[in-house]
Amino acid sequence: MKRSVIENRLQKLFETSPVVVWDDPAGEFADNLADLDLPGATVFVDRDGERFELKALVNGLAATDRLLIYRATPEGAVSPATDTSADWLADVMSYAPIFTADAASTQLADLNALDTPEMRAALKQFAPFFKRASGVKRVHELRASFSTPNELALAVITAALGSDTPATADWTLIAFMACAHEQGSVDAQDKLERAGAWGAFCRMTRDYVGFAGDASKEDELSVHVLMSALHAVAPHGLAERDSGACLARGGDCGALGLESDVPAVLAAEHGAPSPAASEQTARHASEVLRLWLSIAHGAGTVHDALLHAAQTAEHAYGLPAWFGSWPTDALAQIAAFPAVDETLIKRALRALAANERVDENLRTALDQRRTSVWHDRFAATYAALAAALDIEAFGQLSSIDSDARVVWNTYTTSWFRMDAAYRRFRLAFRTARNEVPSLDKDLHRLADHIETRYRCDFLRDSAAAWEHAAEQDLATNGYVADIPRQRDFFITEVEPLLRKTKRTWVIISDALRFEVAAALGEELERTTQGQVHLASMQAGFPSITACGMAALLPHAKLRMTPHVAEPGRNPAGFDVFVDGLPTQGTPARQTVLQTYLDTYHPGMKGVALQSSAFMNMERAERKEAVGAASVVFLYHNRIDAIGDDATTEHDVFDACRDTITELCQLVSQIVREFRASDILITADHGFLYTAQPLGETDKVALTEVQGQIAAYGRRYVVGMRGVSSDAMMPVSLTATSDGELQGLAPREMIRIKKAGGGENYVHGGISLQELCVPVLHFKNFRAGSKGFRDRSYATLSLVSPLTTITNASFELQLLQDDAVGGKVLSATYELGFYLDDGTPATEVRHVAASSAEPDAINRTNWASFHVRAAVMDHVGATCRLVARNVDDPSAEELVLARCTLSISVGTSFSSDW
């Protein structure tokens, strides 16, 4: 420090006290005292034999006198500035300001660190790091003050690694392991050696987590942490019984040179000693792992380092085979190893494929895995399992009333969910097949089972119930009485809106079956300010595009007109007219629409457009295309375009997913640009789809039909009057053809044999999946308007009574307050206990609030917590259980409980680190 700076600082201190003590432990400035320019001040050097004189001088100071006492501390002695217990000048030291100018004192002062021999030794050890001007600043940013060398060491290690994490032992270990994974353990070691911190780091790993190996060797430290934590929770007695066989089937604990760190339960057969880790270091290792898990969600180096360590440990110790012998409830507590997820999934897959009940413990474990760190690695497989469990939960169809309306209403309120679950399963299965190769065989077995459950049980039984109830009406009228009909759509749905809104929007999505529309409604509720009402209507026969599109247009009369058969051409086909006008193609449909408006609403204009063309227009072009139209029909075609093509029919469920996305975008565009308040979304028909090849018993030949055929498809026959078949159901077409035509429909899921491919995706028949057409009414609301309901996230509340925490580990039951659906959105919460000063008292747990169960008892969940060793002895401290919404960081945190820590422990688990 420059002399002028020293003089200036001393003068400022004299302004506050007549006596200033200069503490110079190393005596660096003893030879420079005579050169100081301190007007009016006496400089006295504290030496042995001269303290009586110094004491007298102090006691005789006049009011205007100034005295600088210079004190040097011999090597190894305690500075009087720190310890005044045996100091002749203790009274002076109690009030006189202390001045230091040596480099160590300055650095310690800048760090707000105690000036002790131990701290000076630590500072000397880290001298390479503090040579850089930014060293002190960076370390001080990590911690406000330092009382021990270990605190300083942790901050230096953290800073040297370039980490922004807190400078605590657990965070520092994770920072090193992440750095070692990303840059190599040699580079990570080099960073600490250049900072003079490698020795301190090695001591910390030994003292804190019991690691006696070489941290410079790839993976040793990280695997030690994982295995020490696993050892602490291994089911008692299980490992001693099974470890030898487990390791023989694939374990190689020597591959990492980890014999000394192998948990005793796994090392017994290899003669390796048990780890010397104490209960304290084992607890610390578990805390490190819990912290690692809580911050490893999502991509990133920390996540990748944990994955690499877990997979290395799995291979080295043969863990997948060992986990296979664990009970489910014990496995459910293990979150660090992907092999645990794989084991749980495999158990569920095999139980379902064998038509066995998945026990409650396994269901709970799978449900809790939704927030696990490895969920994304198995996302498609978990999705397939969830859908399969929904299918199994559906059970067998109960006996159904013979009233067709009851069957219809049962389908639109309950049965359609089976179609949705099957669609979700097939979508997930396509991806899951390539997700985890070791699960491929089990997945295919499950897929076979699900196909049987859906096709042979549900579809067959639901079709039988519907046919039994509707057969007479279909044969007599061609439709079921008292169920809304598609041909009345314009009168019942569009006309009322014409009278009260400036413009009515109608979106017709080809083959948008009811269950897909239900999913669309949920997505619209979730992503917009609008609200959705979903109803249904029955399509006409045959349930094909030509008939459905015509029926949705305004009309008084719909007629199916057969083509005149040409020689050698049979069947010849038919056309569909409304009020004498053709309906094939968008221009023809606009003509029908405008003709109706001219007749019944003079002055109104109607527009019909393809949605793809509409969305591809510029904003100004869309405005111009719509103009002053009072009715806009937008035709969307994704599902049918994919399904009707034999080369792409197996992509139809992907098309359903894409349709939901596209229709949401279309609705948002209409609302944003045209301020639409009401939008109707419907379809011309539904569809049937089963993934696996059909057998011969699932088909009927056209030779079973007697009479002249006008047209036919996989699921229908339209013939001239008198056509019949003992293998098919008659469907009257009298009302739509003046008795000229007659319909025939294959029963259940039977397809008509036809040349060419394309038999898995079909429509045209009378099944509920084909006939049940959605009528989705989307109503937009402006914020604050009457009827507006804002979106909100599902919240959590605590079920378990909690006033005092008396155990180091405990479980709490949580309730998801509302079912997810409509405007209630799913959310993931980070839950943790915190002391009043913000210090974490436990690890952070991730809990999902995503249940759509209407019954509150089915929306409960359990979360386990472990009190951190550092706060175990804070008896009487108050803490809060805080829930933070991961999906909405701006949301206010929820305080679910306030309680008191009161843990009685025989052994302290606190650490010098």
Residue locations for each model-derived region?
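Active-site-adjacent beta-strand anchor residues
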Residues: 507
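…; additionally, a secondary subgroup of soluble metalloenzymes is captured
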Residues: 1-504, 513-679, 683-913
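Ligand-binding pocket scaffold of soluble enzyme catalytic domains
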Residues: 510
